[in-house]
Amino acid sequence: MTVSRDHSDSDEWSRWLLNLRHGGDPTFDRAIRPELEAYADRVLDGAELKTDMTLADIGTGEGLVAFRAIDRVGPSLHVVLTDISATMLRHAEGLASERGVRQQCTFVECAADELTGIPDTSVDVVTTRAVLAYVANKAVALSEFYRILKPGGRISLAEPIMQDDAFAACALKRMVDERGTQSAGDPFLPLLHRWKAAQFPDTPEKIAASPIANFSERTLFESVRVSGFRQIHLELHIDLRPSTIPSWSIFLETSPHPWAPPLSTIMADLFSPEERQTFETTMRPLVESGQALTTGRTAYLNAVKPVT
């Protein structure tokens, strides 16, 4: 899921994938694996892979999609794994060796919008899982996908839709601004806004400038259409579920995406000691009760490059 050169520190991706996604807790990492594998499997369902094909897994991260593709198709599948993070590519290459599939894999360090080293019309399928969301110029990335695909080739994408999270941060900001000094009667509300605003844009201007928030499933569909793809099918999945985070300590150390600091950093940098106590007194019982809910929004899209 690591892709764009918009942020100067490419290793932010490895820090998130190998640590912040699961709060540095190996048990929690294992607990969320089935959910991650379900995302990958749905991408592969849309990929329609067959024997003797070449798959380009863009922003491969740990190689989850790539390795599950090999498990499905077998030894005739060749996979090109790309990532902007050299750390993640090394990690994925090590996993490929452990799984005995290194000979089926080619590793390419590049961004999703600059697929250097992959020739024109050289792959049958392009997959992404949480990749385009982080690319500033999604049209350029899609044109690269189109370039490397053979005529009749497919894209199968799974992208998080985080625009509603940004809209919620904007709503919190408006509430705090409208209440002004009256917010003193509700000391938690400004802290809630501060937390969310550190992880998602909280003004229309910030949303417009943010790759993760300035697009929706509809604009994603239209971008794919304008890029020349046809037979486009998109499904938006919105799921309200109980939070899987099992403890306050893990809650503090996780973050929702690679560009978001964990709550522990936000509280240390932006809250006073008194505010940290107020926030924990309010939030910790909810987290530890197991009653907290989370909403996930994912767009699954597949499309075909025309033969002519």
Go through each PLM region and give its residues.
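A short SAM/SAH-binding and catalytic strip from SAM-dependent methyltransferases
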Residues: 124-139, 161
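A short glycine-rich, Lys/Arg-flanked "PGG" loop and its adjoining helix->strand segment in the class I
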Residues: 139-154
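Conserved class I S-adenosyl-L-methionine
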Residues: 156-195
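Conserved alpha-helix/loop element of class I SAM-dependent methyltransferases that forms part
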Residues: 34-53, 68
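Short alpha-helix
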Residues: 212-227
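A short acidic, Gly/Pro-enriched loop at the edge of an enzyme's catalytic core
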Residues: 113-125
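Class I SAM-dependent methyltransferase SAM/SAH-binding core
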Residues: 54-58, 62-115
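C-terminal helical/coil "lid" or tail adjacent to the Rossmann-like core of SAM-dependent
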Residues: 2-31, 231-289
